[in-house]
Amino acid sequence: MAKIRLIPQTREFYTLFDRAAQNLVVTAQLLLDLLEHYPDRRDLVDEIKEHEHEGDAVTHEIVQLVNKTFVTPIDGEDIYDLATALDDVCDFMDQVADELNLYGVDEVPPEAIEQAGVVVKAVSKLADAIGCLDGLKDVSGTLVDIHTLEDEGDRIVRGATARLFRDGHDPLVVIKWKDIHEDLEQAVDSCERSAHVLESIYLKNR
């Protein structure tokens, strides 16, 4: 007997997820530029904040659309989980930018720039995977790449934390940079959480 599917007419969900993903790509590059040129490019903090607000707005639109759509293209709970995971990526990037100003940072260690580079790569892979959501194309290879980048991020943050304590920095400096390093790593972790949701969606609907 043929399998019956109720296919919704709207493609809005995919459009909104693409918007969220592209917003992350831009935000990640801005964060890398900020860290590479801090404090000269403090102006980028405000620009990152604008993109964080855009991320919140898209998340709100997705949640509203779930609530008013009778038949969603994929499970409504999965849509919500993916939207919030993507929003978390943006929130952590924004938090890092805020902390640079809040903590009065004068100089950025190379490990933080390395971490931001990992964020850029992870977000780019995530955007590729989001682009495959419509049609449920296999993204297993891309998701493996994101996991590999998360491992790389873990390695960098462990090395950065060890150096902070080893080099005898002022305790306040250690606390400041430990927070920033951890939030950069959380941004990558949120990419991996998003990837896990995407994997679940693919397995449920293929």
Language-model segments: residues:
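Cytosolic, long alpha-helical scaffolding segments
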Residues: 1-206
